[in-house]
Amino acid sequence: MNTKPVLVILGPTASGKTELAFRIARQTGGEIISADSRQIYRGMDIGTAKPPRWMLDEVKHHFIDKKEIGEPFSAGDFAEQAAEKIRELHQRGITPVVAGGSTLYLEGLLKGFAELPPADPEIRAQLTRELERHGAEALYRRLEALDPEQAKTLDPTKTQRLIRSLEIIEISGTTVTALQSKTPGPPTGINFTVIGLDLPRELLYERINQRTSAMIQAGLEAEARYLFDKFRDEWRSKNLNALATVGYRELFEHFEELHDLDTAVSLIAQHTRNYAKRQLTFFRNRLDVEWVKAPLDEAEIEALVEFFSTRQDDSVPHSPIAIAKKQNA
């Protein structure tokens, strides 16, 4: 059994995961497994910051452009299929590099999913009525009181997960956070080394603002307009969760004349910053991550390349960068 560590690079949006994973995969002859729940959809390119075509051509990426918008693909599907892909790459002697920031994709792959109670139609219907009557903020405040750690990881506007969290609490009599602590563990035969890219908040926010501007300049408005025209009915009926992605939903609201373009762009940057905060909260509270100061310098990148090119045992080092540097000294 191949127990060579599998490198996982995670971090908040705009932290540099794509570029670092590409460099390591290219220099190790590896392939990238994208842990991004939006890049998996075809047609959502600029707004999800997909790697440019030259990167995709130079290094094989998996789980990008795999599905049409609207095709079902759950975090459980990703965890199962990503584990299968890692085993396949190991059998072929290829180094897999997992990179992404989708919290549930990463949790499912790294820890497995806790056993949660099935949906209760009556409780869900009651919560839905409360949502319609009192709004999402009231339900979010309730979740904050009952399970503050879970609330910190949720976008208050994503009502599906909000209702599910409250439903689980109502059914089980305990919190989602407590239930999620009882996970089955990583896939059999796969050993992960997880590093998180830790940027100073000011730098991270600056990068988010710059990327938002770059997306607009690259044609995000036209991309969103095409999707809005194609999925207008689904957007209005809230039947496609993918369409609620930051960067698209603000422009869709602009197309509905709820605000002007400048406001939409400002909201994209603001909502992306909020999303980055929720990602960091989730990673720090729910996953075992070795955080490294980013951006990494050349010596640190080369140390990672060397470490994952040569290491064959099944130990998970506390600091792969530090150990690799020591070995190469």
UniProtKB/Swiss-Prot annotation:
Native organism: Chlorobaculum tepidum (strain ATCC 49652 / DSM 12025 / NBRC 103806 / TLS)
Protein name as annotated: tRNA dimethylallyltransferase
Entry's EC annotation: 2.5.1.75
Enzyme class: transferase
SUPFAM superfamilies: P-loop containing nucleoside triphosphate hydrolases
Family named by the database record: Belongs to the IPP transferase family.
Residues given in the record as substrate binding sites: 13-18
Top-level taxonomy: Bacteria, Pseudomonadati, Chlorobiota, Chlorobiia, Chlorobiales
UniProt-listed Pfam families: IPPT
Superkingdom, natural source: Bacteria
Positions that bind ATP: 11-18
Site (Interaction with substrate tRNA): residue numbering on this chain: 102, 124
Annotated spans, Interaction with substrate tRNA: 36-39, 160-164
Cofactor or coenzyme needed: Mg(2+)
InterPro entries registered for this protein in UniProt: Dimethylallyltransferase (IPR039657), IPT (IPR018022), P-loop_NTPase (IPR027417)
Alphabetical GO biological process terms: tRNA modification
GO molecular function, one term: ATP binding
